[in-house]
Structure formats: C-alpha cells, structure tokens
A protein has these predicted regions:
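Extreme N-terminal starter segment of soluble prokaryotic enzymes
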Residues: 1-4
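Glycine-rich Rossmann-fold phosphate-binding loop(s) that bind the pyrophosphate
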Residues: 9
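Hydrophobic/small residue at the entry helix of a nucleotide-binding pocket
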Residues: 12
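A short, Lys/Arg-enriched amphipathic alpha-helix followed by its capping loop at the start of a domain
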Residues: 16-27
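Short, polar loop motifs at secondary-structure junctions
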Residues: 31-37
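Active-site-proximal loop->helix
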Residues: 38-43
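Glycine-rich, highly charged phosphate/nucleotide-binding loops
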Residues: 44-63
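Glycine/small-residue-rich loop that forms an oxyanion/phosphate-binding "nest" at active or ligand-binding sites
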Residues: 63-90
C-alpha cells in the first residue's frame, strides 16, 4: 500500500516523488510512458508504474492502494488526465 500516488508528467512531479521517497513515504509514481519511467529510479519507498490509465483504471488503483494523498503533477495541458484523476478520487 502506498501512502501517496503521484501522477508525474513534469520535472516537478519527478522531484516530488523523489522527495517523498527520500523522506520514507511509500510513493507510487504513475507516468504515461516508459521514457518517463527512466526519469525516476525505484527504491524501497518509490515504485514507478508506466502506462496511461483511464478513469476506471484510476478508480481501481485508488481502491486497491487506498492512498492518503493523490497528487496531480501532470503537464498543465493534460486536462483530460487531470479530470480523470479528479473523478477517480470522488
């Protein structure tokens, strides 16, 4: 179970994911592509999941992991992803 799920599509998303894991918070960083996953190095507190998720897949992920916090650090133009994250959290 991850305390935080970060949707990382920006440099800031990668930095947030690293910061949280360095402070011993279990983080799942979701990135859209394999290329994006190369920007993060997994460790005992950081797991990286590559692949685009639709709203239902996000709901399933949130139900399964029961995170305390979900962060949207996707690209500002990724409005559809932001809406899916918001809907998935409801």
């Amino acid at each position: 179970m991850y305390k935080v799920i970060v949707f990382a599509g920006t440099t800031e998303g990668y930095e947030i994911s690293r910061f949280l894991s360095e402070n011993q918070l279990p983080v799942l960083a979701c990135v859209a592509t394999e290329y994006g996953s190369k920007s993060l190095q997994e460790n005992s507190c950081l797991h990286v999941q590559a692949g685009r998720l639709d709203e239902q897949q996000m709901r399933n992920l949130f139900f399964r992991e029961k995170p305390e916090l979900v962060l949207d650090a996707t690209h500002p133009y990724a409005a559809d992803v932001t809406q899916n994250i918001r809907n998935g959290c409801e």
